[in-house]
Structures are given as structure tokens and as C-alpha cells.
């Protein structure tokens, strides 16, 4: 099914694989299948059950990458069949770097947009913890409740000369996050396969993988709130003015941002904190079509 590598040495990123280091929050949501399908090509089969698929978001802060230091929010629409497993499909990728945005669009086929990440940390008193909860937390079977700070991350998309609020993510920061000696979970290695492409910047259907090595543990899901109505109206007006640009995407004009926000606001089921993250992104390959054979 894979036929060729894409041109990966352009745009200043150098040759693959590309290495990203930092920390991240990986939060899984139950996403309505009808919303996820708005982003996924017709030839790809959505993994769904009872009208829902598994999506969510990946909020990362990189302190070392081919594009330097920057923040990233990947909104995951859902899972697409790739027998015998499945691949994630990104609905929107917001990055705090022009270089990362251009590379994502042109090389990896991602729906990337430049964004501003504004962070505000507020100190909170720590809550008492029982002996049993403390033991379970240390072995990774219970989320920590010793919150020392919480952090609000306001994500604002920068489109031409317009700034539009996407969402606010309230992340609970635990005491051990502030203390490098704190227990941050077991060291794991895993592979996250992804489909991408079918955009106005890259019309090919692509597949790439992220090889992740990090300390991981379960945490309390972040609380997400959407933008104000004025920002929503601003986005729709901006989309209308740029309607002469044809997109390969199936998402109706003026709704891409709204569908992405609906994914962010959907029901969270699991949140994983990645510390000492090292992510190795392989070169994307062009595929002929998504396989529908799930047997």
C-alpha cells in the first residue's frame, strides 16, 4: 500500500527522523462519529461504536526540537482503520512556531495553524491524601490529588491579521511535577501511528508514526472551555472572505474551527501525563488508500 517517501529534507527541518523533547498531556475523549467524519476522507473507515470514536488532544511543550522551543496542540478527530490496528487523524494542529506550521503543512500533510499559547499559573493549597491513596499513586494505579498549582493555557489561533480564541485548557499541576525528584511514573516506549494529508497544502494521503519514550502516569483530565461567541462570529466571517481558496477537506466552509472545538469539549475518559518526553517522528509515506478490511 505504501508507494513512496515524501520530500522531507526541505523547510529547514533537516533529514528525518525528527526528534522532539519536552513534556505533554495526552487526553482521550469520546467524540461523536458525525463530528469526526467531517475531517476524515471518504475512502477511510472510522473506528466507531454506538455513534462514538476515540479522539481527544495532545498538548505538548517542547524545549528541544528541529524548530526550537514551542508549544503544540493537536486536536485528534478520531481513529481510522488500518488493519490489524488503527491510526489517529488530526482535525487541527496549532503550533507556536511559523517553521513548525510550514513543515507540518507541506511535508507531513497536517492541518497546521500558527497559534499563541498564553499560560497563567495559580497556586492552590495542597489537599490531604490518605495512606491508601498515596500507595496507589506511587505504583501508578491512582491519579494524584496533591495539586499545588493549576495552569490555564489560552490557545489563540493567528490567521492572517486576526487572532481567534480556540479554547482554554485548565491543567492541574501536581507537586511532583514541580519537584524533579518526584515519582513521574514508569518509563515506557510506544508507537503512535497516524494518517494525514488530503489538505489544500498536501493532497496526498499520508501515513507516519511517532515513536515515544517517556515517563507516563494517569492524571486528572484537564478542563476545557470554548471561545466566546464574538470569536466564533469572527472565524465564520474570516472563512467567508477566503471562500475563493478551494480545500480538499470534506469539512464544510466555516465549520472547521467549530468541529475542532467540539472535539475539545467532548467527554474526557483518560488523561496521561508524559514527562521526560522524547518523540521520534518518522518520515511520512504516501499510501494509495485506507484499507476497509477489518477482518
From Swiss-Prot:
UniProt protein name: Protein NEOXANTHIN-DEFICIENT 1
Phenotype seen when the gene is deleted: Pale yellow flowers. Absence of neoxanthin and reduction by half of xanthophyll levels in petals.
PANTHER family registered for this protein in UniProt: PROTEIN NEOXANTHIN-DEFICIENT 1, PTHR35467
Species name: Solanum lycopersicum (Tomato)
SUPFAM superfamilies registered for this protein in UniProt: Acetoacetate decarboxylase-like
Gene Ontology terms: biological process: xanthophyll biosynthetic process
Function: Required for neoxanthin biosynthesis. Probably not involved directly in the enzymatic conversion of violaxanthin to neoxanthin. Is necessary but not sufficient for neoxanthin synthesis. Seems not required for abscisic acid (ABA) biosynthesis in response to drought stress.
Gene: NXD1
Source domain of life: Eukaryota
Region (Disordered): 221-251
Amino acid at each position: 500500500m505504501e508507494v513512496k517517501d515524501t520530500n522531507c529534507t526541505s523547510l529547514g527541518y533537516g533529514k528525518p527522523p525528527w526528534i522532539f523533547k519536552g513534556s505533554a498531556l495526552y487526553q482521550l475523549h469520546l467524540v461523536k462519529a458525525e463530528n469526526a467524519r467531517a475531517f476524515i476522507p471518504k475512502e477511510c473507515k472510522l473506528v466507531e461504536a454506538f455513534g462514538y470514536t476515540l479522539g481527544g488532544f495532545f498538548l505538548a511543550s517542547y524545549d528541544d526540537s528541529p524548530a526550537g522551543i514551542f508549544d503544540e496542540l493537536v486536536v485528534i478527530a478520531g481513529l481510522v482503520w488500518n488493519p490489524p490496528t488503527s491510526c489517529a487523524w488530526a482535525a487541527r494542529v496549532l503550533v507556536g512556531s511559523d517553521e513548525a506550521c510550514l513543515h507540518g503543512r507541506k511535508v507531513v500533510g497536517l492541518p497546521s495553524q500558527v497559534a499563541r499559547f498564553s499560560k497563567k499559573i495559580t497556586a492552590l493549597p495542597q489537599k490531604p491524601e490518605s495512606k491508601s491513596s498515596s500507595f496507589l499513586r506511587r505504583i501508578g494505579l491512582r491519579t494524584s490529588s496533591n495539586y499545588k498549582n493549576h495552569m490555564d493555557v489560552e490557545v489563540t489561533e493567528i490567521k492572517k491579521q486576526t487572532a481567534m480564541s480556540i479554547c482554554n485548557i485548565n491543567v492541574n499541576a501536581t507537586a511532583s511535577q514541580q519537584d524533579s525528584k518526584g515519582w513521574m511514573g514508569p518509563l515506557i516506549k510506544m508507537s503512535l501511528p497516524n494518517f494525514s494529508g488530503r489538505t489544500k497544502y498536501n493532497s496526498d494521503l499520508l501515513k507516519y508514526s511517532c515513536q515515544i519514550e517517556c515517563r507516563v502516569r494517569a492524571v486528572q483530565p484537564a478542563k476545557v472551555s470554548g471561545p466566546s461567541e464574538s470569536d466564533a462570529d469572527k472565524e465564520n466571517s474570516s472563512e467567508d472572505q477566503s471562500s475563493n481558496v478551494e480545500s480538499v477537506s470534506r469539512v464544510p466552509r466555516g465549520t472547521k474551527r467549530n468541529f475542532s472545538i467540539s472535539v475539545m469539549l467532548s467527554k474526557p475518559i483518560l488523561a496521561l501525563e508524559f514527562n521526560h518526553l522524547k518523540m521520534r517522528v518518522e518520515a511520512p509515506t504516501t499510501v494509495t488508500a485506507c484499507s476497509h478490511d477489518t477482518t
